[in-house]
From Swiss-Prot:
SUPFAM superfamilies: Carbamate kinase-like (SSF53633). Belongs to the UMP kinase family. It catalyses: UMP + ATP = UDP + ADP. Gene3D superfamilies: Acetylglutamate kinase-like. GO terms for molecular function: ATP binding; UMP kinase activity. The gene is pyrH. PANTHER family: URIDYLATE KINASE, URIDYLATE KINASE PUMPKIN, CHLOROPLASTIC. The keyword Nucleotide-binding applies. Pfam families: AA_kinase (PF00696). This is Uridylate kinase. Homohexamer.
Length: 240
C-alpha cells in the first residue's frame, strides 16, 4: 500500500442523490464519471475500495410508503434502484480502466453477481472495486445500515461517507449560518446529540465493531483521495 494512505481497505458510501449532479431526478453522466475518477485515484494509491450506493435519485422506499404503498414493497423497489446506480458506476469505472464487480443482495444472476462475502474479499485482494447493491436485501433497512454491515463484513478500516458538505455539523450549514463543524466525534456523542450522520442502526454497528466513520464532501475534487491520506477537511467518528 502507498505510504501516504492511512487505510488498507475502505468502504465508500454514496447517496443516490449524489449521482444526480444538478438534475432533479436520475443520473448525471458527468457526475458519475467524476466519481469514478475519484474512486480510481484512491484505488491507484493501493487502497482496496468497496462501495455502497443509495437509490434515492430513482426511488426512495420511505417516500413510497408515505404515499400509501406497503413499506416492504416500497423498500424492495428502492433496493432495485440501487442496482441501477451500481451498474452505472461500474460502467464508469471500467471506462477508466478499473476492473469492477457488482454484487447484489437480491439475486439476479444475468445482471450481476450475488453477494458472497469470501468472493467479495477475493475481488478486493485482486485490486478490483466491489460495488454492493440492493442494500441488505431486506426491507426496513437503509443503505446506510447496509454500508455499515458490509464495512464490518469486509473487515474495512473505515467507512467513508460522501456527503454534500465537508463534515458533520451541529445543524444543516446550508440552512443555519452559525452551525458548528466538528473535526472529531465519538459514536456516543453523535447519538446523544442526534446528529444527522447515519441512522442509529448504522452508527451502532460501526461502534460495536470499531469501524470509524469518516464524513467528507463528495463534490470537492480530490477529496476522497485526500481523506484516505488523512488530509483535507473531514469529520472522523470513532470510539473514545
Amino acid at each position: 500500500m502507498a505510504s501516504d494512505a492511512k487505510f488498507r481497505r475502505v468502504l465508500l458510501k454514496i447517496s443516490g442523490e449524489g449521482l444526480m449532479g444538478t438534475r432533479e431526478y436520475g443520473l448525471d453522466p458527468e457526475t458519475v464519471d467524476r466519481i469514478a475518477r475519484e474512486v480510481k485515484s484512491v484505488r491507484d494509491l493501493g487502497v482496496e475500495v468497496c462501495v455502497v450506493i443509495g437509490g434515492g435519485n430513482i426511488f426512495r422506499g420511505v417516500s413510497g410508503a408515505s404515499s400509501g404503498m406497503e413499506r416492504a414493497a416500497a423498500d424492495n423497489m428502492g433496493m432495485l434502484a440501487t442496482v441501477i446506480n451500481a451498474l452505472s458506476v461500474q460502467n464508469a469505472l471500467e471506462k477508466v480502466g478499473v476492473e469492477t464487480r457488482v454484487q447484489s443482495a437480491i439475486v439476479m444472476p444475468t445482471v450481476c453477481e450475488a453477494f458472497i462475502r469470501r468472493r467479495a474479499i477475493r475481488h478486493l485482494e485482486k485490486g478490483r472495486v466491489v460495488i454492493f447493491a440492493a442494500g441488505t436485501g431486506n426491507p426496513f433497512f437503509t443503505t446506510d445500515t447496509a454500508a455499515a454491515l458490509r464495512a464490518v463484513e469486509m473487515g474495512c478500516d473505515a467507512l467513508l461517507k460522501a456527503t454534500q458538505v465537508d463534515g458533520v455539523y451541529s445543524a444543516d450549514p446550508k440552512k443555519v449560518k452559525d452551525a458548528v463543524r466538528y473535526d472529531r466525534l465519538t459514536f456516543n456523542e453523535v447519538l446523544a446529540r442526534d446528529l444527522a450522520v447515519m441512522d442509529t442502526s448504522a452508527i451502532a454497528l460501526c461502534r460495536e465493531n470499531k469501524v470509524p466513520i469518516v464524513v467528507f464532501d463528495l463534490h470537492r475534487p480530490g477529496a476522497f483521495a485526500e481523506t484516505v491520506s488523512g488530509r483535507g477537511l473531514f469529520t472522523i467518528i470513532a470510539n473514545d
